[in-house]
Amino acid sequence: MYNESPIIRRKSSRIYVGDVPIGDGAPIAVQSMTNTRTTDVAATVAQIKALENVGADIVRVSVPTMDAAEAFKLIKQQTNVPLVADIHFDYRIALKVAEYGVDCLRINPGNIGNEERIRSVVECARDKNIPIRIGVNGGSLEKELMDKYKEPTPEALLESAMRHVDILDRLNFDQFKVSVKASDVFLAVESYRLLAKQIVQPLHLGITEAGGARAGSVKSAVGLGMLLADGIGDTLRISLAADPVEEIKVGFDILKSLRIRSRGINFIACPSCSRQEFDVISTVNELEQRLEDVVTPMDVSIIGCVVNGPGEALISDIGLTGGNRMSGYYKDGVRQKERFDNNNIVDQLEAKIRAKVAMSESRIPAQDVTK
């Protein structure tokens, strides 16, 4: 099966966010950000756990006030996934959450303050072995850069990032990653491409403020897809005006599409037409919901007729090809004698998938339980 990605990733240095490796060939980490009030500890903890359940490697939490910093302490005690504290304006908040076991500090060069304040944050991070993300955003560039460039440009985002990279270099601090996000795809992509040529540190990817679930997913897939295909990127966040859980799902779907990193079922399904012998759309939708808990990577093709069905099944772990009343079943690219009743496809296919997952994870004896 054609599963190897042809992408050659950019060489970068290695940092750790908690126990998650970032850069230097480590799996590209998928992260999201809570949208609850951080001072609502119960709601924030619940959302973090929901994100962890769908595979989030890292979760970012906004910490806008000292009260939020105190809440962060409680949140950290009740969660397991590495947490990034998102800090703007008041550098003292960064110093406070560092005391509470934060796994990474995100600072915004556009509003964190002068070099002396950055020095205080860096010395604290060094002392406690906490990495930093320099998070440049096209919507909050420094005033002098806006005066110079008149608008956000790739060169402006790059200059903002490099100013702070230089500060960290002068302070002999190399445990950091960098992002240069923008809401415009071309602006973000060109900014990252320029930055990738300038530094060796890991890059955190994102199209900021991408939009709602549908449009934002498309915009992020286009922008991040361009960068990832170039080998650029060590961690990513899909920024959606939607449930943060969707950000994780879309992030993994993008990585899965490029064969960079797979998690769970990769459904290969036809859009359906009058040749379909069963309801493809409802079958796929139902199986996606039922199998959300599956982590093991697996390709499952669900094709409604025999035009493309057999060909797709040949390169799938499990394949289904629509037939008159009974549909053909393939396992590891081989047509099986067993056929599926078109009126009971979802239950039958779920059982086969779960059995194969169990075999892959060695939870049951290695025998053909699906023949």
Swiss-Prot record:
<keyword id="KW-0408">Iron</keyword>
<dbReference type="GO" id="GO:0051539">
    <property type="term" value="F:4 iron, 4 sulfur cluster binding"/>
</dbReference>
<keyword id="KW-0411">Iron-sulfur</keyword>
<dbReference type="GO" id="GO:0141197">
    <property type="term" value="F:4-hydroxy-3-methylbut-2-enyl-diphosphate synthase activity (flavodoxin)"/>
</dbReference>
<keyword id="KW-0479">Metal-binding</keyword>
<dbReference type="GO" id="GO:0005506">
    <property type="term" value="F:iron ion binding"/>
</dbReference>
<comment type="function">
    <text>Converts 2C-methyl-D-erythritol 2,4-cyclodiphosphate (ME-2,4cPP) into 1-hydroxy-2-methyl-2-(E)-butenyl 4-diphosphate.</text>
</comment>
<dbReference type="InterPro" id="IPR045854">
    <property type="entry name" value="NO2/SO3_Rdtase_4Fe4S_sf"/>
</dbReference>
<keyword id="KW-0004">4Fe-4S</keyword>
<dbReference type="InterPro" id="IPR004588">
    <property type="entry name" value="IspG_bac-typ"/>
</dbReference>
<dbReference type="GO" id="GO:0019288">
    <property type="term" value="P:isopentenyl diphosphate biosynthetic process, methylerythritol 4-phosphate pathway"/>
</dbReference>
<dbReference type="InterPro" id="IPR011005">
    <property type="entry name" value="Dihydropteroate_synth-like_sf"/>
</dbReference>
<protein>
    <recommendedName>
        <fullName>4-hydroxy-3-methylbut-2-en-1-yl diphosphate synthase (flavodoxin)</fullName>
        <ecNumber>1.17.7.3</ecNumber>
    </recommendedName>
</protein>
<feature type="binding site">
    <location>
        <position position="312"/>
    </location>
    <ligand>
        <name>[4Fe-4S] cluster</name>
    </ligand>
</feature>
<dbReference type="GO" id="GO:0046429">
    <property type="term" value="F:4-hydroxy-3-methylbut-2-en-1-yl diphosphate synthase activity (ferredoxin)"/>
</dbReference>
<dbReference type="Pfam" id="PF04551">
    <property type="entry name" value="GcpE"/>
</dbReference>
<feature type="binding site">
    <location>
        <position position="305"/>
    </location>
    <ligand>
        <name>[4Fe-4S] cluster</name>
    </ligand>
</feature>
<keyword id="KW-0560">Oxidoreductase</keyword>
<feature type="binding site">
    <location>
        <position position="270"/>
    </location>
    <ligand>
        <name>[4Fe-4S] cluster</name>
    </ligand>
</feature>
<comment type="pathway">
    <text>Isoprenoid biosynthesis; isopentenyl diphosphate biosynthesis via DXP pathway; isopentenyl diphosphate from 1-deoxy-D-xylulose 5-phosphate: step 5/6.</text>
</comment>
<dbReference type="GO" id="GO:0016114">
    <property type="term" value="P:terpenoid biosynthetic process"/>
</dbReference>
<comment type="similarity">
    <text>Belongs to the IspG family.</text>
</comment>
<dbReference type="InterPro" id="IPR016425">
    <property type="entry name" value="IspG_bac"/>
</dbReference>
<feature type="binding site">
    <location>
        <position position="273"/>
    </location>
    <ligand>
        <name>[4Fe-4S] cluster</name>
    </ligand>
</feature>
<keyword id="KW-0414">Isoprene biosynthesis</keyword>
